[in-house]
Amino acid sequence: MMLLPVTVVDGFFDEPDDVRNYALSLTAEPDAEGKWPGSRTANLAEINPKLFDHTCRRIASMFWDTRDAQEFVQWQAQGGFQLVDSSYQSGWVHHDAGEELFTAIIYLTPDADASTGTSIWEVRDRAVDIPKHIKDQKFPALQQQLSPEDAEEARLALNSYYKESIRVNNKYNRAIVFDSHLYHA
């Protein structure tokens, strides 16, 4: 059951250049376990609660009336900035595990390559289990423990179990919000 429709909003931030410049001023680290490509900043709730709250409210307002919600609505959210350079060409199909209800991605790269973005994927054949050894190659690949050739072979092997359903291009200041349990890359 999908909790939210895939939603795309252009012009997400009122001052995207300011947000981008702030993001680039922060320290970002790669994940030690290789859970994601590139590097991420610390949780925005800890380093800039005002921006974090503004962003969460803006996302929530895409689906619910939040004008009077300050007194009685609470949420748990985690967010930060992720920096991925152009050498990372294609993603690994995955879903966000855990209790997350939805995922939001806001693109802040001006003049991004038109082939980049986020796609929603579907399992090709639900009767086929993806072999564990294929799924388990993602983390060593993102930790650069595999050669680029072996990492690409592993990514293609995993992604072959899925078919692209929706594609959202990377456009400056565009947000995509979707159910966290949907497969995406």
What name fits each language-model region?
Residues 1-91, 117-118, 124, 131-145:
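Non-heme Fe(II)/2-oxoglutarate
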Residues 84-183:
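Catalytic core of non-heme Fe(II) oxygenases with the double-stranded beta-helix
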